[in-house]
């Protein structure tokens, strides 16, 4: 669940930490778990093939040993599936995206590339009888491995191959993955920022034709791949392109595709913490809270549909117009006050007011689920807005229970 990019949290580093600890205690179980990160037969894997280099890098950071047995297992597993892909290529069958994520020889993971290459073509190393021949054998391993990866990448029509070869006009927009689209959409549209304005990046016809292909695709398709993107990434992109209608349309369609993996969640209230502490870590906590809050408001039932409660030192209800796009919802929430406090107790009083004003009976109110999207740096509470005294010796939960109990008795 922690690593699952479709139905779980999609956490990377936390998953690597958990798996590493598990692997040390139960090696066979660790092997099985990692394989499910990268491949599951007839089903979407929990992670992606990029986990190969990421997990190996994590093991090195913990052990300072690039020859650790966990890394050796991952290398063997990777080349096993690479061989299977090559066999499928010769039969013109579908292959995985593994070759796209193999570390490159000139990248920061070049040590892993070399390890993979020598593992795949170890027969060349066994025949070397002196240091010069061994050096030549290693180079032969690297060369053959590069060719193998290149052959597979051409077969799966990887956009990066066409980008590197300057064959931009032949990139097929519908073949571009969600992550590649997010990272390279400016390049695909042949644009760059010049101060506050967007200008043409290159005058080459090759790039202009690519831009026209993507514009046509964006305008004619109802959705753009976005299922594997994190909600915070989409919120971040929405804020980044707040003055760019063309990019907003792309982000809105990716959000629509991303939302298809979620279902209706019943009587659920989204409570979004907009206090200053949420802006740590490049605002990732805040962007996650906004994105998840919007998603919950879209999937909840009638009473709280299109509504979000933000809370810092002063909670506030935000009601979305039913015709608002995802980007417009992000900009609307941007107007929420970004205070330095988190008054959770007052937020709970706001929810109680809605329940009382709508004459919702206690038995129905008890079925509500409140999802709190916060780093939980919450203020202490002594008095409420009704002037009622709350014991400072009680926990906040006790005070909230007393508040709702009193309202239930008066209903």
Briefly describe each language-model feature range.
Residues 1-288, 298-411:
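Long lumenal/extracellular ectodomains of secretory and single-pass membrane proteins
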């Amino acid at each position: 669940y922690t690593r699952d990019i479709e139905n779980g949290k999609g956490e990377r580093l936390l998953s690597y930490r958990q798996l590493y600890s598990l692997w040390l205690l139960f090696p066979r179980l660790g092997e099985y778990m990692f394989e499910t990160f990268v491949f599951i037969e007839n089903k979407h894997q929990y992670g992606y093939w990029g986990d190969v280099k990421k997990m190996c890098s994590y093991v090195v950071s913990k052990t300072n040993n690039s020859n650790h047995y966990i890394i050796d297992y991952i290398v063997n597993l990777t080349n096993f599936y690479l061989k299977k892909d090559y066999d499928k290529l010769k039969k013109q069958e579908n292959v995985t995206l593994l070759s796209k994520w193999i570390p490159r020889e000139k990248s920061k993971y070049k040590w892993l590339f070399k390890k993979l290459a020598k593992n795949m073509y170890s027969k060349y190393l066994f025949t070397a009888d002196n240091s010069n021949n061994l050096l030549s054998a290693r180079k032969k391993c690297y060369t053959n491995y590069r060719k193998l990866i290149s052959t597979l990448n051409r077969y799966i029509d990887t956009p990066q191959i066409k980008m590197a070869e300057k064959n931009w006009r032949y990139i097929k927009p519908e073949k571009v993955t969600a992550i590649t689209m997010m990272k390279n959409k400016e390049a695909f549209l042949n644009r760059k920022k010049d101060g506050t304005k967007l200008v043409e990046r290159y005058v080459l016809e090759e790039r202009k034709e690519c831009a026209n292909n993507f514009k046509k695709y964006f305008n004619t398709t109802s959705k753009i791949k976005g299922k594997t993107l994190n909600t915070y990434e989409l919120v971040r992109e929405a804020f980044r392109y707040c003055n760019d209608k063309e990019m907003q349309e792309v982000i809105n369609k990716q959000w629509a595709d991303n939302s298809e993996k979620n279902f209706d969640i019943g009587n659920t209230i989204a409570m979004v913490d907009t206090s200053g502490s949420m802006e740590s870590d490049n605002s990732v906590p805040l962007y996650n809270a906004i994105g998840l809050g919007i998603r919950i408001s879209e999937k909840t039932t009638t009473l709280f549909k299109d509504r979000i409660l933000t809370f810092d030192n002063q909670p506030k209800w935000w009601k979305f117009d039913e015709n608002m796009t995802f980007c417009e919802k992000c900009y609307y929430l941007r107007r929420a006050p970004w205070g330095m406090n988190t008054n959770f107790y007052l937020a709970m009083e706001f929810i109680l007011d809605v329940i009382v004003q709508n004459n919702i009976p206690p038995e129905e109110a008890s079925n509500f689920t409140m999802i709190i999207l916060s780093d939980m740096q919450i203020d202490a509470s002594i008095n409420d807005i009704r002037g009622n005294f709350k014991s400072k010796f009680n926990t906040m939960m006790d005070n909230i229970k007393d508040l709702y109990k009193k309202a239930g008795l008066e209903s």
